[in-house]
């Protein structure tokens, strides 16, 4: 309903790449309707001071970026599903980053019109942050995006995300995580789409005890997610307080705030 629907893999007009610092790699970019991926090429570079300041605004450090395989990309070249070549280059005004994984890379261009580009087979099992989770833990947040995962990690929380808030959350993944974490909590954006999707996912995953926490943010473009929450000066203790407050007031599958 509304903006909350299953997200298809983006058409071949979007692709991505991965590689070691200062090197080029040639892998394959995803096509939405063909199993055979398209070729792509990407070049990494060192983070600039401006790029580190962008991540650092919500507390994300170089160590966190490194731990989660997040890199700075200088250039990306790929093909559309029709075989037409295209590419992007990083600039100070339009930086380009990559979230690397065993499957490939998801390119993130926060200041650009085309913000996300996929390279490799993301598939329905894409889950950012899963490999960094401990074998056991108390609290796990399910967020709407990679940057939110990084922000939460920078503040000492465990978190993962799927392709987007509108993606279907694989029940098999949650089923495994239930045995590893005491609390699994949806922490999505507070705009219309985020609220609709977090409630839909909460209902779909109620049998696993998944809960929902809504941040005290207005839902505007500048104030809608946990990254904005920490950028505004809120602390780890405040977020933990919100969680504890909700868990004290509400119990069972109807636990939501």
Region locations from a protein language model:
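Acidic beta-strand-to-loop metal/phosphate-binding motif
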Residues: 140-142, 181-193, 216
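Metal-dependent DNA phosphodiester-chemistry modules and their immediately adjacent helices/loops
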Residues: 220-256
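Phosphate-handling DNA/RNA-contact segment within nucleic-acid enzymes
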Residues: 76-182, 198
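Short, aromatic/basic amphipathic alpha-helical patches
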Residues: 174, 196-208
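TOPRIM metal-binding catalytic domain and adjacent DNA-binding surface shared by DnaG-type primases
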Residues: 4-103, 118-138, 242-257
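Short, acidic/turn-prone active-site loops that include or flank metal/cofactor-
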Residues: 163-168, 189-190, 217-219
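A generic structural motif
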Residues: 211-221
């Amino acid at each position: 309903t509304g903006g909350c629907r299953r997200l298809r893999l983006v058409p071949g007009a979007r692709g991505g790449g991965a590689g070691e610092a200062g090197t080029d790699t040639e892998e394959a970019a995803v096509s939405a309707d063909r199993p055979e991926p398209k070729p792509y090429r990407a070049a990494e570079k060192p983070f600039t001071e401006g790029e580190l300041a962008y991540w650092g605004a919500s507390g994300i450090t170089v160590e966190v970026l490194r731990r989660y395989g997040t890199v700075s990309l200088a250039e990306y070249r790929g093909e559309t599903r029709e075989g037409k070549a295209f590419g992007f280059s990083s600039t100070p005004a339009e930086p380009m980053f990559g979230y690397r994984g065993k499957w490939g890379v998801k390119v993130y261009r926060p200041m650009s019109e085309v913000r996300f580009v996929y390279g490799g087979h993301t598939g329905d099992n894409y889950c950012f942050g899963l490999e960094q989770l401990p074998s056991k833990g108390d609290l796990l947040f399910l967020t709407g995006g990679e940057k939110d995962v990084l922000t939460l990690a920078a503040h000492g929380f465990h978190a993962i995300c799927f392709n987007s808030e509108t993606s279907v959350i694989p029940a098999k993944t949650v089923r495994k995580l239930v045995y590893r974490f005491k609390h699994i909590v949806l922490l999505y954006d507070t705009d219309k789409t985020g609220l609709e999707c977090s409630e839909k996912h909460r209902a779909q995953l109620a049998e696993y005890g998944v809960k929902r926490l809504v941040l005290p943010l207005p839902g505007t473009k500048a104030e809608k997610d946990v990254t904005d929450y920490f950028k505004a000066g809120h602390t780890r203790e405040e977020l933990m307080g919100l969680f504890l407050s909700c868990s004290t007031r509400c119990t069972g599958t109807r636990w939501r705030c």
